[in-house]
Every structure is written in structure tokens, then in C-alpha cells.
Amino acid sequence: MRASRKGDALAQLLYNEGIRSQAVLNAIAGTPRESFLPDALKHKAYQNTALPIGQGQTISQPYIVAKMTELLLDSPNKPEKVLEIGTGSGYQTAILAQLFAKVFSVERIKTLQFQAKRRMNQLDLHNIAMKHGDGWKGWASKGPYDAIIVTAAAASLPQDLCDQLKEGGRLIIPVGNEQQSLLCIDRIEGELKTSTIESVRFVPLVAGELM
């Protein structure tokens, strides 16, 4: 996808905020964020802020999208197969699809999943498989995964997601209720090694499915 002036300006802002991966910055610059927003909010597409997309959900702040993606790219195992929990608008999905060979994405709200799938087709991104399902359970039949990224805050670490992570794999997940932390978890010799990245604010990771 070709970068726009607004996309370039957003990428520069994220660079100033500490994002250093040129691959991530290029993907952000070239992805039309307005395509993932309701008409009434399209004028805010290139602001570095989270925005509502309906169904009580949000499109994440571009900085946090870039930060989480950069953490995946920095994984020592050079991931190719990525699982995303919480498709939402599909914005994070589109960024991932430009940087990894295969992306699997699970969304519990059917309406959002349908809309996101349509956007992927419009953007000519075809290395993505989507599923309507319970994000807490992951997508075991397609695993294990080199990397897993979760775009909603879990009250505790979901065991099913840990079980679907390959040896040498990396899981990026916000954890907590009122106080949330972004965690980077690596599976090393069968053990999970956890690093806390920064404080964050996400919508909760809710169990179950919603039509």
C-alpha cells in the first residue's frame, strides 16, 4: 500500500514517540486508517488516539499498534505465523498482514468480524484467515504459532493461548482490570519468561461469542 502525506506524518509522530522499526513505520504510513472508522470519525483517522468503532469496542491508538507489532518483529525466532486475538476493526490485522507471512485472527463479535473481512478484501490483503469465536480459547486447530498478539486486556493470562505458543514463540498481551500492563512473554525451553513493557488501557477480553 502506498503512503499518504497524513500517513507519513503519523509515522513521523510515532518515530518521535520511540518506534524505531522502519518496517512498522512503513506499514503504518501506508495503511489508510480512515478505512477502519465510521464516517463520523474519519477526520480523526490520523490522530494518535484510540477511537470507538461500535459494539463497545475501539480501534487502538496507533502508537500501541506500532509498539505491539514492533515487539513481535523483535522476537528472536523471526515469526512468520501469527495469531491475533480481537480482530476489531481489522486495523491491527492489516498492519500484521504486511509484515508476517500468515495471520490468523479471532473476533468474538460477528458484525465486526464480517466488516473486517470485507476491509481486508478491499485492501487486497489475502494472507489472513479469520474466525468468529472466543478469543480466550485461541484457534488451536491452526496452531501452534510463532507469535500471538492480544488486542484486549485479559484479567489473567489465558492458558489456552500459552499452550498454542511454539517453543521460541512470543506472546504480547495486556493483562489486568483497572490497572493494566502490557506483557511480553517468551517461551524458552518450555518455560514462560515475562517482561512488563508499560502501562496500557484496553477494552476487556470477554469470553464467549456474540452474533
UniProtKB/Swiss-Prot annotation:
E.C. code: 2.1.1.77
InterPro entries the UniProt entry points to: PCMT, SAM-dependent_MTases_sf
Pfam families: PCMT
One GO location term (cellular component): cytoplasm
Keywords, alphabetical: Cytoplasm, Methyltransferase, S-adenosyl-L-methionine, Transferase
UniProt family annotation: Belongs to the methyltransferase superfamily. L-isoaspartyl/D-aspartyl protein methyltransferase family.
PANTHER family (alphabetical): PROTEIN-L-ISOASPARTATE O-METHYLTRANSFERASE (PTHR11579), PROTEIN-L-ISOASPARTATE(D-ASPARTATE) O-METHYLTRANSFERASE (PTHR11579:SF0)
Full protein name: Protein-L-isoaspartate O-methyltransferase
UniProt source species: Alteromonas mediterranea (strain DSM 17117 / CIP 110805 / LMG 28347 / Deep ecotype)
